[in-house]
C-alpha cells in the first residue's frame, strides 16, 4: 500500500524527463469519453483495460485498441461480453490473431479524444499537484465533450 502523498500515490511515474502521468481512457464511436484512469508514467496500458471496459462493454460492439492491449485476458473479457476485439497482435505473439483492418482505421477516435482533452492547458501540463484534482479536471472536461 502506497502513501497518498508518495509519487506513486499521486499517479507520478519516473521517466527520463522526470515525473510523468499517464491518462488511460475509453471512448464511444463518436469520440466521447466513457471511462478514465490515471497512473504513473511507467505503468503499462494493458492492466488498465479491464477497469476501463467493465462499465460500458455491450454485446455486438467492436472494441478497438492498439497493440499495447493485446493480452489474452483482455480479449477474454471482450469475448465474454459478446463484443468483438479489433486489436492487432503484438510482434512477439507466437500465433498472431487476425483483426479487421478496415474497422481498425476508426481507432483514431481515441486519439482525437485524447487531443481534445489536451487542448486544455491544465490537462496537457498537469498543473495540479494532487492526482485527485488532476483526475477531477479531466473528468470535468470529459463531461463537457458530452454536452
What feature does the model see in each segment?
Residues 1-91, 138-142:
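Polybasic low-complexity intrinsically disordered regions
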Residues 75-82, 96, 101-147:
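Basic, amphipathic alpha-helical segments enriched in Lys/Arg and hydrophobic/aromatic residues
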Amino acid at each position: 500500500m502506497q502513501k497518498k502523498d508518495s509519487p506513486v500515490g499521486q499517479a507520478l511515474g519516473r521517466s527520463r524527463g522526470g515525473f510523468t502521468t499517464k491518462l488511460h481512457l475509453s471512448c464511444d464511436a463518436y469520440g466521447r469519453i466513457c471511462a478514465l484512469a490515471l497512473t504513473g508514467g511507467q505503468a503499462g496500458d494493458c492492466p488498465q483495460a479491464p477497469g476501463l471496459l467493465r462499465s460500458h462493454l455491450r454485446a455486438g460492439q467492436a472494441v478497438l485498441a492498439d497493440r499495447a492491449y493485446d493480452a489474452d485476458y483482455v480479449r477474454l473479457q471482450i469475448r465474454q461480453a459478446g463484443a468483438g476485439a479489433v486489436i492487432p497482435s503484438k510482434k512477439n505473439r507466437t500465433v498472431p490473431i487476425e483483426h479487421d483492418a478496415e474497422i481498425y482505421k476508426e481507432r483514431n477516435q481515441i486519439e482525437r479524444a485524447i487531443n481534445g482533452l489536451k487542448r486544455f492547458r491544465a490537462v496537457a501540463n498537469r498543473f495540479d499537484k494532487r492526482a485527485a484534482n488532476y483526475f477531477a479536471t479531466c473528468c470535468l472536461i470529459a463531461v463537457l465533450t458530452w454536452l
